[in-house]
């Protein structure tokens, strides 16, 4: 948002754009975009399989309130956690957030991978703010963890754009074509990222969609405050 509003990036066209859904493109005009989503990381419920049984795993936001999960949940201070809180507020409302506070959710000042390592070690039993791609990688290495989507899977999306004053604009366009094309997207999948034009068995949520930079900053601050007031340190 800020890059577009500041004029740092410029509109571009690519033959690869046709396969991308409209929601994955920030349109500049009828044929050009400011950027297109080239990778997505999805946030959902990650849990230690030795500490939470299959019967206890929540299938939606409401089931985070199960009595057997009280005192077992945690989140981080990362902005990604605030985005999940924003989605909970959107779909479940203030009353749900007040009840969630009674679950004694712990708050950790950690980046996502450090937080995941606590989950693997059993310091944390489960969290609704865990990245699917990170769980897949660690699960493949034998870690006792798994991941499920809830009502929505909040997407952290990365995009490909062209810098306005790129010294070699044609090379920049070729690189962008590669990244958003078939071969580039295969590379993204090797890192277990999601692909914007593929279907997944969950609904994706983009909290920032339709907002200006200022609107999103205000919303994220509100969500962060709600995150802190709902959790325990």
Task: Specify the residue positions occupied by each region the protein language model found.
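A bilobed periplasmic-binding-protein/Venus flytrap-type ligand-binding module shared by bacterial periplasmic
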Residues: 44-52, 156-168, 187
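Short, hydrophobic alpha-helical packing/hinge segments within bilobed ligand-binding/sensory domains
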Residues: 115-118, 134, 172
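Extracytoplasmic ligand-binding site segments that recognize negatively charged/polar headgroups
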Residues: 1-120
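A ligand-binding cleft/hinge motif common to bilobed small-molecule-binding domains
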Residues: 1-2, 125-144
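Short amphipathic alpha-helical coupling segments at ligand-binding clamshell hinges
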Residues: 96-100, 167-179, 187-188
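An extracytoplasmic/periplasmic, membrane-proximal ligand-sensing/linker region
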Residues: 193-233
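Periplasmic-binding protein-like
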Residues: 41, 69-76, 99-101, 106-109, 141-166, 179-199
């Amino acid at each position: 948002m800020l890059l577009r509003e500041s004029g740092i990036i410029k509109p571009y066209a690519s033959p690869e754009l046709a396969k991308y859904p409209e929601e994955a493109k920030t349109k500049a005009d009828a044929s050009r975009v400011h950027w297109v989503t080239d990778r997505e990381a999805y946030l959902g419920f990650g849990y230690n399989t030795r500490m939470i049984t299959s019967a206890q795993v929540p299938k939606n936001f409401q089931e985070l309130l199960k009595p057997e999960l009280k005192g077992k949940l945690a989140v981080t201070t990362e902005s990604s956690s605030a985005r999940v809180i924003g989605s909970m507020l959107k779909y479940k409302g203030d009353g749900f957030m007040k009840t969630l506070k009674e679950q004694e959710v712990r708050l950790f000042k950690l980046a996502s991978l450090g937080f995941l390592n606590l989950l693997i070690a059993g310091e944390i039993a489960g969290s609704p703010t865990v990245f699917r791609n990170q769980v897949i990688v660690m699960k493949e290495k034998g870690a006792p963890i798994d991941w499920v989507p809830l009502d929505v899977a909040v997407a952290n999306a990365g995009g490909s754009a062209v810098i306005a004053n790129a010294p070699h604009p044609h090379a920049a366009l070729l690189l962008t074509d590669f990244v958003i094309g078939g071969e580039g997207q295969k590379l993204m999948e090797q890192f277990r990222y999601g692909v914007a034009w593929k279907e997944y068995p969950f609904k994706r949520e983009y909290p920032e969609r339709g907002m200006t930079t200022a609107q999103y900053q205000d919303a994220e601050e509100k969500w962060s405050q709600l995150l802190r007031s709902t959790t325990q340190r």
